[in-house]
Curated annotation (Swiss-Prot):
PROSITE patterns: RIBOSOMAL_L27. The keyword tRNA processing does not apply. Pfam families: Ribosomal_L27 (PF01016). Residues 1-24 are annotated as: Disordered. Keywords: Ribonucleoprotein, Ribosomal protein. GO terms for biological process: translation. The gene is rpmA. GO terms for cellular component: cytosolic large ribosomal subunit. Transmembrane segments: none annotated. Belongs to the bacterial ribosomal protein bL27 family. It comes from the Bacteria. PANTHER family: LARGE RIBOSOMAL SUBUNIT PROTEIN BL27M, RIBOSOMAL PROTEIN L27. This is Large ribosomal subunit protein bL27.
Length: 88
């Protein structure tokens, strides 16, 4: 006979680290080439002029300039597009 109560096991107790997704440079901000603009999963925001897209869908600036967001109309749903306007 056991004189101590056996402790049960649980299948909980795990959680992943946050991935720090989101907008890193907002509209009107000045950025340099290579700056990360948005970290995202999937293309919720589309790349525009002077913006590149990494293999993990991260959007980054290709040139120095000012960040500009615009709303574009697509079939079924509206989308956002981010561009970098060259500062003069």
């Amino acid at each position: 006979m056991a004189h101590k109560k056996g402790t049960g096991s649980t299948r909980n107790g795990r959680d992943s680290n946050s991935k720090r997704l989101g907008v890193k440079a907002y509209g009107g901000e000045t950025v340099t080439a290579g700056s990360i603009l948005i970290r995202q999963r999937g293309t919720s925001v589309l790349p525009g002029v002077n913006v590149g897209q990494g293999k993990d869908d991260t959007l980054f600036a290709l040139t120095d300039g000012v960040v500009a967001f615009e709303s574009i109309r697509r079939s079924l749903r509206n989308r956002k597009r981010i561009s970098v306007v060259a500062s003069s």
